[in-house]
Structure formats: C-alpha cells, structure tokens
Curated annotation (Swiss-Prot):
This is 1-(5-phosphoribosyl)-5-[(5-phosphoribosylamino)methylideneamino] imidazole-4-carboxamide isomerase. The gene is hisA. Its EC number is 5.3.1.16. It catalyses: 1-(5-phospho-beta-D-ribosyl)-5-[(5-phospho-beta-D-ribosylamino)methylideneamino]imidazole-4-carboxamide = 5-[(5-phospho-1-deoxy-D-ribulos-1-ylimino)methylamino]-1-(5-phospho-beta-D-ribosyl)imidazole-4-carboxamide. The active site is at D11, D130. It comes from Acidothermus cellulolyticus (strain ATCC 43068 / DSM 8971 / 11B).
C-alpha cells in the first residue's frame, strides 16, 4: 500500500494511557487503560501502534510488564519507545515481539552503542529525533543533545534505517505539524521518516501525506485522536489523499 501510515500513539505513565503537552512531566491528561486504548485502535483499523513507556523515558520507573502484555494482546505491528538505552533495556523491548524499537536518548549519549545495535538489528531499530529550535532534546526532552543535522549525518553514516522526528514544541499542543522541519530532515537523509507532533486537523494529516514523495512514510497521532478531533478512520482516509 502506498500513502502515509498512521500510527496511533499509546503513551503509558503509572500504568495509565496519558498524553503530555510538549513532553513535559506533570502535564498528563489521563485516558484510562492503555491495553483498552491499543485494542480500540486495532479495532478501528490501525496497522501500527506507537507504544511509549513515559516513566522509562523520564527515568522514573517502568511499565515494561504492561507494555509486554499490550504487544502480546494486539495483532498489529508495534513500535516500542521509552527508556531503551542499553543492552538490557533493548533485550527486554525486543523480547516483547514488537516490530521495532525507537531509541532516543542513547543515540545522542552513547553513539558507539547505537552504531553496534543498528548493525546487529537493522530495521528493528528506529532512532527518535526530538527537536527543539534545531537542537536535539534528550532524557525525556529535558537535556540538550546537540545540533540536529550533525547528529543526523552521523546516524546516517552508522547505517540507521529510520527516523522518528518530533517537534517537541508542538507535541501534544494541537498546534499543527512542523512541515519545514520534516522537509529539512527528508532533504538531509535518504532514510524513511516517521513524523510526530502537533497534528490538529485532517488538513494537517494531508499536509504530512504530501511529503510521502520526499521520504515521510508514517505519522504518529495522539492527542487529536484522544480528544475526538477526528477519527482514526478519517485520518487514514486523509493519509491516502
């Protein structure tokens, strides 16, 4: 199938499905059971789910058993993210049977390790590029991780298969996607890009879908779906427009 793949987000904190504003701890809006959310997105037609352990991302705990249960219970592909920074956390994540993992902070803080795991696992590894004003954010978006395009060039050279690009300032705000950022990343790499952050309307979905020829293959949507701005089915239809 051509077109843009929609990945509904299920972010987990304290065992609950939540959404944050600009990735900031303490801004959570709770949406109940993450397993029920994941099963609901599957029932609505999702082919992928973006599943995040926010507690692990912020270094304040883990929901690993719950995430493993969710991956086991759904029949769709899962992209697993949050706190995957070393061999043990990567082993646990891959052992869930997820389709791929998204590595964020470690790609900035431990480039030698990322080079090794990318070489070993290939398509199973995506690297999250969380961007604020042209700089990369690390450790749950609270620390600076360096200049975006310098890091991107290094990751490309290391053979990274895919990038998940988030504009931190827009995530969870319904403020619209950063199309310029996505264009710039696509121009700088020939690897596929999954976009994330700020989707507020079906027009936003169509705007990102227009970037498919440039290299954008997927779009993560969270708050707009949970807030009922549009349905997953409507988003999937807009993504093929």
């Amino acid at each position: 199938m051509t077109g843009l793949e929609i990945l509904p987000a299920v972010d987990v904190a304290g065992g609950q499905a939540v959404r944050l504003v600009q990735g900031a701890a303490g801004t959570e809006t709770r949406y109940g059971s993450p397993l029920e959310a994941a099963l609901a997105w599957q029932a609505a037609g999702a082919r992928w789910i973006h599943l995040v352990d926010l507690d692990a991302a912020f270094g304040r705990g883990s929901n690993r058993e719950l995430l493993a249960e969710i991956v086991a219970r759904v029949d769709v592909a899962v992209e697993l993210s949050g706190g995957i920074r070393d061999d043990e956390s990567l082993r646990v994540a891959l052992a869930t049977g997820c389709a791929r993992v998204n590595i964020g902070t470690a790609a900035l803080e431990n480039p030698e390790w990322v080079r090794r795991v990318v070489a070993e696992y290939g398509e199973k590894i995506a690297v999250g590029l969380d961007v604020r004003d042209g700089r990369l954010a690390a450790r749950g978006w609270t620390k600076d991780g360096g200049e975006l395009f310098e890091v991107l060039a290094r990751l490309d050279a290391d053979g990274c298969a895919r990038y998940v690009v988030t504009d931190v300032a827009r995530d969870g705000t319904l403020g619209g996607p950063n199309i310029e950022l996505l264009r710039a990343v696509c121009a700088a790499t020939d690897r596929p890009v999954v976009a994330s952050g700020g989707i507020s309307s079906l027009d936003d979905v169509r705007a990102v879908a227009a970037l498919v020829p440039l290299g954008v293959e997927g779009l993560i949507i969270g708050k707009a779906l949970y807030a009922g701005v549009f349905s997953l089915r409507e988003a999937m239809t807009a993504a093929q427009a």
